[in-house]
UniProtKB/Swiss-Prot annotation:
<feature type="repeat" description="Cell wall-binding 6">
    <location>
        <begin position="259"/>
        <end position="278"/>
    </location>
</feature>
<dbReference type="GO" id="GO:0008745">
    <property type="term" value="F:N-acetylmuramoyl-L-alanine amidase activity"/>
</dbReference>
<dbReference type="InterPro" id="IPR038765">
    <property type="entry name" value="Papain-like_cys_pep_sf"/>
</dbReference>
<keyword id="KW-0081">Bacteriolytic enzyme</keyword>
<dbReference type="Pfam" id="PF01473">
    <property type="entry name" value="Choline_bind_1"/>
</dbReference>
<protein>
    <recommendedName>
        <fullName>Lysin</fullName>
        <ecNumber>3.5.1.28</ecNumber>
    </recommendedName>
</protein>
<keyword id="KW-0677">Repeat</keyword>
<dbReference type="GO" id="GO:0042742">
    <property type="term" value="P:defense response to bacterium"/>
</dbReference>
<keyword id="KW-0378">Hydrolase</keyword>
<dbReference type="GO" id="GO:0044158">
    <property type="term" value="C:host cell wall"/>
</dbReference>
<feature type="repeat" description="Cell wall-binding 5">
    <location>
        <begin position="237"/>
        <end position="256"/>
    </location>
</feature>
<feature type="active site" description="Nucleophile">
    <location>
        <position position="34"/>
    </location>
</feature>
<dbReference type="InterPro" id="IPR018337">
    <property type="entry name" value="Cell_wall/Cho-bd_repeat"/>
</dbReference>
<feature type="repeat" description="Cell wall-binding 1">
    <location>
        <begin position="152"/>
        <end position="171"/>
    </location>
</feature>
<comment type="function">
    <text>Lysis of bacterial host cell wall.</text>
</comment>
<dbReference type="GO" id="GO:0044659">
    <property type="term" value="P:viral release from host cell by cytolysis"/>
</dbReference>
<dbReference type="Pfam" id="PF19127">
    <property type="entry name" value="Choline_bind_3"/>
</dbReference>
Length: 296
């Protein structure tokens, strides 16, 4: 089954002035954004399923899978009905950073956009100038009978980093994800890339650490020259911690474990041993020069 451009145009025309624009509720039937409207229009025209309504970042590869060819990259071209434009450089076009739509003739485009709160027909160059003349790509259908290659699932890697493709073709983005094959939680940033060897302060107010392989830290973890303790859900612990039969103290601000030192907590002083354990009934001696020594 190939892509029929006229069916795609008809899908958009049928919804012109009848749907609203929304990046939060982009899967219809009452609202779409620029990329989801293009996705569903081309799906109605015979394009293959990606498992989700691809955004402008992932639309490039999806178009090529469905028989489109990149015919212009930020260079003049003679537009034809059915050409699809994508504004915004790859890697920086997701969300409000990009835009896409379809040409219905050499000058005009049909697109779902914020300015008209829905699907409208406009002069391409006017809208492009109004948007600040963004970097652009143009794709044209050259093989209407293209059969998309088998989708790659699981862990994927490119020059930027790792991401994870789910069985339904979607990918985690700006969220935690439990990967069964790794038996661990991971976190993926707003571009879908795995965090590695990084701290994350989440919107829940907690701090999390992900090691060089992206695994979320739990229990004790040495990071740099300090030790930290993380709950089973990965959140960093501060204050007193009872671990088996011993007590430890992690800084209330930074979370690093204190050791070989006195700490003041509430109205008392506590002695922590070199390995961080709270000393059990230490004996103190005040030397003639005022130095306090401890016997543990």
């Amino acid at each position: 089954m190939g892509v029929d451009i006229e069916k795609g145009v008809a899908w958009m025309q049928a919804r012109k002035g009848r749907v609203s624009y929304s990046m939060d509720f982009r899967d219809g039937p009452d609202s779409y954004d620029c990329s989801s409207s293009m996705y569903y229009a081309l799906r109605s025209a015979g394009a293959s399923s990606a498992g989700w309504a691809v955004n402008t970042e992932y639309m490039h590869a999806w178009l090529i899978e469905n028989g489109y060819e990149l015919i212009s990259e930020n260079a003049p071209w003679d537009a034809k009905r059915g050409d699809i434009f994508i504004w915004g450089r790859k890697g920086a076009s997701a969300g409000a950073g990009g835009h896409t739509g379809m040409f219905i003739d050499s000058d005009n485009i049909i697109h779902c956009n914020y300015a008209y709160d829905g699907i409208s027909v406009n002069d391409h160059d006017e809208r492009w100038y109004y948007a600040g003349q963004p970097y652009y790509y143009v794709y044209r259908l050259t093989n209407a009978n293209a059969q998309p290659a088998e989708k790659k699932l699981g862990w994927q890697k490119d020059a930027t980093g790792f991401w994870y493709a789910r069985a339904n073709g979607t990918y985690p983005k700006d969220e935690f994800e439990y990967i069964e094959e790794n038996k661990s939680w991971f976190y993926f940033d707003d571009q879908g890339y795995m965090l590695a060897e990084k701290w994350l302060k989440h919107t829940d107010g907690n701090w999390y650490w992900f090691d060089r392989d992206g695994y979320m830290a739990t229990s004790w973890k040495r990071i740099g020259e300090s030790w930290y303790y993380f709950n089973r859900d990965g959140s960093m612990v501060t204050g007193w911690i009872k671990y088996y039969d011993n007590w430890y103290y992690c800084d209330a601000t930074n979370g690093d474990m204190k050791s070989n030192a006195f700490i003041r907590y509430n109205d008392g002083w506590y002695l922590l041993l070199p390995d961080g354990r709270l000393a059990d009934k230490p004996q103190f001696t005040v030397e003639p020069d005022g130095l306090i020594t401890a016997k543990v």
